[in-house]
Amino acid sequence: MRLAEIFGANVRRVRLKRGMTLESLATEAGLAYSYMGGIERGQKNPSLDVAERIAKALECDPVNLLRMTSADK
């Protein structure tokens, strides 16, 4: 699995665990809804700045979004 796919899957898992919609996460992170969807599908490669904004919106450590498991610690 590519790193972009791992990151996207972890973002989706944490977002759903937090009860957030894709739209609310995109808004909170200051990103376009379509771009956020592309990230979750592993089709977009976000910059480190964007990854940090997503992690902040999800209230999680950005490093954990890159791991194969335990993304929501």
Place the predicted regions along the sequence by residue:
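Short basic helix-loop element that most often maps to the first helix and adjoining turn
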Residues: 9-28
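Short, charged recognition helix plus adjacent turn
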Residues: 1, 56, 64-73
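Conserved hydrophobic/aromatic packing and binding residues within compact polymer-binding modules
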Residues: 11, 25-26, 36-39, 65
